[in-house]
Amino acid sequence: MNTKRTLVFLLALSLFMTTVVSAQKSDKLPPIKYQEVTLKNGLRVIMHEDHSTPIVAVNVWYHVGSKNEVAGRTGFAHLFEHMMFQGSKNYDNDYFTPLQEAGGTLNGSTNPDRTNYWEVVPSNFLELALFMEADRMGGLLEAMTMEKLNNQRDVVKNERRQNYDNQPYGTAGEKAVALLYPKEHPYHWTTIGSLDDLTAASMDDVKAFFRQYYVPNNASLVIAGDFDPKEAQKLVEKHFGSIAKGAAITRPNVPTPKLDKEIRVQYEDNVQLPRLYMSWHTVPRFDKDDAALNVLGLVLSAGRGSRLQSNLVYGKQIAQDASAFAPAQEIAGRFQITSTARPGKTLEEIEKELNAEIERIKKEPPTADEIARALNQIESSFIFSMQSVGGFGGKSDQLNSYATFVGKPDYFQTDLERFRRVTPADVSRVANTYLTDKRLVMSFVPRPKGKEMPKTNAAANQQASVSKKEKTKVDSTKLPKPTANPKFVQPNIEKTKLSNGLEVWLVKQSELPIVTMNMVFKTGTTADPRGLSGLAATTSALLDDGTKTRSAVDIANEVQSIGAQLSTLSDDDYSGVRMLTLTKHLDKALDIYADVIQNAEFPETEVETYRNRTLVSLKQRRDNANIVANIVYNRVLYGDAHPYGVTINEASAKAMKRDDLKKYYSTYYRPNNAVLIVVGDADLKTLTPKLEAKFKDWKPSEVSPMSLPDAPTRDKAMIYVVDKPGAAQSVITIGQIGVERNSPDYFPLQVMNSILGSSFTSRINMNLREDKGYTYGARSGFSFRHGAGPFSASAGVQTAVTKESVMEFLKELRGIRGEIPVTPAELEYNKQSLIRSLPRSFETVDQIAGQLANSVIYNLPETYFNDFAVRVNAVTLEDVNRVANKYLTPDKLAIVIVGDRKTIEPGLKQIEGLGSSIVYLDAEGNPIR
């Protein structure tokens, strides 16, 4: 498996790091200017211009979620999220098809309070996105059929299996809300709802729910990006104006839930380690105490220096993890603390320490520094999130969120100010008010070996009939045509070289006051010595755990003091150190950044702490079928003698010494083996002297080029099974060794795989998900590396159709080779999709830095991105057929399946040519004898 260790400081409010610099309360956020109109039918339209990238986002929110359902009819809001992609009156076909051809990306989501849908497309396809959204708002029911409904019910059941039943601790959330909220409360059930309710629902039930809530007066539309508001308003009137207004919406009005005593429950799960959950009722989102409760969560658990981390995780080392957060919703909120026990430790020990920390913060308010640290990180997160116009959490999504829940799209500054008003006394007060003995204490413990796993609703429904989705011919000439294509030009790269040989690439982007620095080292995990797999990743992970002048806590606190993000990673072909900061803190950020890169010390205590935590993580990864499938698949393909076949394991983790880390670091972390990529609000002329001052003492040294052994060859296809008793799904991975990144066949392979399995509308996904209903999603892809990386096609499928799913995968792999010939229309569709999607990957500073990092790692031509469209357009049908037959060989495939052997084995044995010689492996890929 590809070993990675990324220390990413998450932007989510509940996970902000602690800092030490006082928040600058006078600072204002960059303004998000917008125009707003309301149509006669009640649709609220919000428009925000951002011409930095030639893309536009369309974002629609419906003020309906699972809380608008009633007992016995749960899951409707989430089901409609799926149904809205199945075709409507004027486009009765898969919703993704025209938008992905346009180079767009799209998605939707449902939570208890709202349902949202979004598209991000090249700016000349704005009318297409508006037409599609309007047609499903006004014409979904006219195209709804029982076949579509049954198909999407199957997809939802697969989603349940994949995201709940087949995940470690996956049912904790639904169990918690069922205990916290009474049966009559609309938060008593989760968004996915009851599968029994969905199965029992009639077409009339489903249509009635849609007519009530999916109406323009219960929706808001945001358009953000590169467009003309006057023209956009005309298009909105054209496509949405005739949709009928719905009846007035009645919002749920229920009493605030309360617990009158402590509730204690314990559940068994297929997990390695026990986990404790504590939950309390609090307040709704935007309540006067909401901000203080969020800050309480940050003080308790956000970052290495936080109270729970420093005590339970790094101090006493009784917990593998600990988190505290306040997930407030529209009509209620809660506070939750979660912690997983280390091996040999008990949940009783965990609970005792958690209780002590709760009592301490009640009696001892957090320091002013603790409060300020949280506020600085919050401020940064507001600005960092303004980079994207679309997607989840982008500007269009935020404008819609504020419009829906507070009635003011421009609530950004006001929202920040409510956090800035939080005092230490406020945090102590809310802890005393809400974290009482009237709480839910829920534990998940490992199921005893040999004990049968109880059947869930989803598992019990494994034999449900699978509905084939009906196919409808659509006249695509009725779709709006795009305006002229916007011209994409790759960003201008300024280059210089420091006195020690370090290359510096800079792309100036001044739309927002942020800068990212990405130091790319041209060596990664392929340099791991035999017997020390994981060395590169461990070296990377420990870079910021201590330098000659700073401890791990010092580094964390200083980074957080400026609201920055520092992360490290190691991949097959490279290692990297990234710092994202506000421009006003660039000098301080650079000081920390340069120190971590040049002066890592790998303190013995930190090495041992990391080793112990890694050994626990290695034990935990057996719980996750997807991780197991990845590890085993790569080992089956490459064996133990090739670096692509091995990952960190118990033996290598125990064998790794501090001297090994220092040797790897001193060998490969050299300026002549690196390129520093800087993107954002920075000037090369001003920055270069600062870089020279910080890096001048960093000395170059000879770095030998990496050489890879030849990958092993396969002489026949084989099925490999890893038994996971009681698994709710079978995770299937099928493939073979692929091709290196610098192959002349790179572009034909990209086009071929786009047709086969890299997008929602690909052959594999449309077959296994949309046509058969076997899975929540199926995909394929090449992992392009310096050496020949793996090709894989994969999906988590219903256990009952494991054999059938394998056969459909094989059918599609044979089909792309010629049994189901690629058509000229398929070829053109996928080429245009690839070409038109390129500008989206240059929107944020980190996206730009990531694209340039690929140029560094694989020595791509300077004009690579400008030439991208020409290279893709040059791919012919003959090219696609040639590479499919050259690189996909069905008679030599490795087929790895992680699932319930007892259930799936009889069917697998029936597969002609494969079923007679199944190999059985453990979770590390070792043969079971």
Each language-model region and where it sits:
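Bacterial N-terminal signal peptides that target proteins for export
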Residues: M1-F9
